[in-house]
Amino acid sequence: FVAKARTIKVGDPRDPSTVIGPIIRKSHCAFVDAHIQDAVAKGAKLLTGGTHDGPFYQPTVLADVTPAMKVYDEETFAPVTSILRVKDADHALHVANDTSYGLSSSVMTRDIDTALKFAEQLEAGMVHINDCTLHDEPTAPFGGVKNSGFGRENGRCGIDEMTELKWITIQSGRRAFPF
């Protein structure tokens, strides 16, 4: 996982080889830095990343994260992965829901039935099974629960509100009128 994180290209989103674009604003990098420094000061291991060049934050992996750390239950909104050990599936569910936020989550498993049962209990607006936590599809409603938002964007309602319908027809050849 760490080796893969080190290979992820960060940069200009107009470059097709870029995987991670810039943080939303340069000042947010200080916020992310504070989360990482807090975690390391409280015992987390920084396995990779933790640096940025302007608004381009390197993929960061922290291990041995605990509930005492900001990255545990606050939205960092950066390419930061927090790794912590859990005892079993019940403990994993408790940890996943132990936050006042709930935008998106992932369940990784080979057992899809278990994943679906787990997903139903997750307190998140979006749950992705065997995929990353962010997958944007304009036809699907995007939004969180708890303090991660109110309502949804995208989906049918979003498409209806943000588009204009236009009917265009093409008649190839002469139309045969009944008169």
Feature names for model-found ranges:
Residues 45-50:
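Diglycine-centered glycine-rich loop/turn motifs
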